[in-house]
């Protein structure tokens, strides 16, 4: 994980593998981190990844599956089929759209379908899209 700050690049963690922070590429980029990783370890050509549109990823941690998420057209569910336990990542939601207002509105519609502790993260994402 790397962050661009006013003081420069802050490196939190480098992992020579796919990483949770890149799961948004499954729906928001021209090529996913998974395909890029496979290409790298099998010495295949590495096309440059291109961001298709703004994306938001929501980690699902200790959260039961809710099929109502899929009623929202921008939501892509990635469910890991793990036993749900507190603190365990069981999936993630990717939302991607070129229209940031539509993306923010979908996040707003998603809020009541998620546990209350997700609200602050959703609010933060909406602020980044504004």
Q: Where on the chain are the PLM-derived regions?
A:
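Glycine-rich active-site loop/lid that clamps phosphate-bearing ligands
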Residues: 51-85
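Short acidic-glycine loop/turn motifs at beta-strand connectors
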Residues: 4-7, 97-99
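Short, solvent-exposed loop/turn elements at beta->coil junctions and helix N-caps
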Residues: 1-3, 81
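Flexible, glycine/charged-enriched surface loops at secondary-structure junctions
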Residues: 1, 46-54, 117-126
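Active-site "cap" helix and flanking loop/linker of ATP-utilizing ligase/carboxylase catalytic domains
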Residues: 5-6, 15-63
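Generic C-terminus detector
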Residues: 81-130
